[in-house]
C-alpha cells in the first residue's frame, strides 16, 4: 500500500512538473513578446521626440543673433 501511495505521489509530482514547464514556456513567450513590443515603443517614442523637437523652434536665440550686452 505504501508503494501505491509513493507511486501516486511521484505521478502527482511529475504531473505538476510538466504543467510548470508548460507555464514557464508560455510565460517566456509572453515576456519575449513584451520585450519586443517595448523596443518598438521606445523607437516610436524616440522618433516622436525628435520630430517634436524639430517642429518647435527654440525660444533661445543663437549666439550670433544675440545683441551684445550694454557694457560693450
Swiss-Prot record:
Skewed-composition ranges (Polar residues): 55-65
Pfam families, per database record: SlyX
InterPro entries: SlyX
Cystine bridges: none
Chain intervals for the UniProt region annotation (Disordered): 52-72
PANTHER family: PROTEIN SLYX (PTHR36508:SF1)
Similarity section: Belongs to the SlyX family.
Protein name: Protein SlyX
Naturally occurring in which organism (per UniProt): Shigella boydii serotype 18 (strain CDC 3083-94 / BS512)
UniProt lineage: Bacteria, Pseudomonadati, Pseudomonadota, Gammaproteobacteria, Enterobacterales
